[in-house]
Regions:
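Hydrophobic anchor at the beta1->P-loop junction of P-loop NTPases
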Residues: 49
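Conserved phosphate-donor/acceptor-positioning beta-strand/loop module used by diverse small-molecule
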Residues: 129-150
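Glycine-rich phosphate-binding loop used to anchor ATP phosphates in small-molecule kinases
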Residues: 92-132
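Small-molecule kinase domains that catalyze NTP-dependent phosphoryl transfer to phosphate-bearing small molecules
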Residues: 155-206, 218
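Conserved substrate/cofactor phosphate-moiety recognition/catalytic segment
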Residues: 62-102
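Walker A/P-loop
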Residues: 58
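ATP-binding Walker
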Residues: 55
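P-loop (Walker A) phosphate-binding loop of NTP-binding proteins
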Residues: 52
Length: 218
């Protein structure tokens, strides 16, 4: 559902959009603020950026948002993982993919969707839509991931690693191993960027270069 109105500034458009997740009976609302006339070019490219908790997804997302806001729309997909039942999570992810592609369609910018989810989780999506989805995982070695998680906690609450939820840490290490061990020839195909010896700026550079190569093909 789309409701369109003119904003106070001449030429600006605000679009109130709704997406209904049939499984959850939840209506997702979001607004698009478009400067000037709406662009007609339809990009509809969706990049799914995955990686274990603590690997640096949010930091890299902020860098990309600051650098390339005219090229990418950055969205975080934490809500995809809040439900406990697999069938509900699947429906929720499909709804979020619809939202992402809708935003890309309306803004003529590619959407970069950050979510800790394996590509297999999106296999139930329509094949034509799936062709426009591109998967990449951010990984690093185990010791580096521990160091980053420890640093994250110190910044947030000045706690040492011994006080971090051990279950949370172990789950993150396991997921990082799965992402690291996945080959690019598995379906769906997934690119992998090893950030072990890279800072956030360098990691953002590699991610941007990979996405740019794909966009030039469309």
């Amino acid at each position: 559902m789309v409701k369109r109105r003119r904003d106070a500034c001449e030429g600006d458009i605000v679009m109130n959009r709704e997406h209904v997740c049939p499984e959850l009976k939840i209506v997702f609302h979001h607004k698009l603020f478009l400067k000037g006339k709406m662009k007609m070019k339809k990009v509809k490219q969706l990049f799914i950026v995955s990686g274990a908790m603590g690997v640096g997804k949010s930091t890299i997302a902020k860098i990309l948002m600051a650098r390339k806001s005219d090229t990418y729309i950055i969205l975080k997909g934490d809500l995809c993982n809040v439900m406990a039942f697999p069938e509900v999570i699947s429906e929720c992810r499909k709804t979020w993919v619809d939202i992402c592609l809708d935003i890309s369609d309306q803004t003529s910018r590619a959407v970069v969707f950050y979510v800790d989810a394996y590509p297999d989780c999106f296999c139930g999506i329509d094949e034509e839509i799936h062709k426009r989805m591109h998967f990449v995982s951010l990984v690093c070695d185990e010791e580096e991931l521990k160091r980053r998680i420890e640093g994250k906690y110190r910044e947030a609450s000045h706690q040492r690693i011994s006080n971090i939820d051990k279950t949370w840490l172990e789950q993150s290490l396991i997921r990082n191993q799965v992402y690291s061990g996945r080959t690019k020839y598995q379906y769906p195909e997934m690119e992998r960027i090893d950030t072990t010896d890279l800072n956030a700026e360098q990691s953002a550079d590699l991610l941007d270069q990979w996405m740019t190569r794909i966009l030039t093909k469309w």
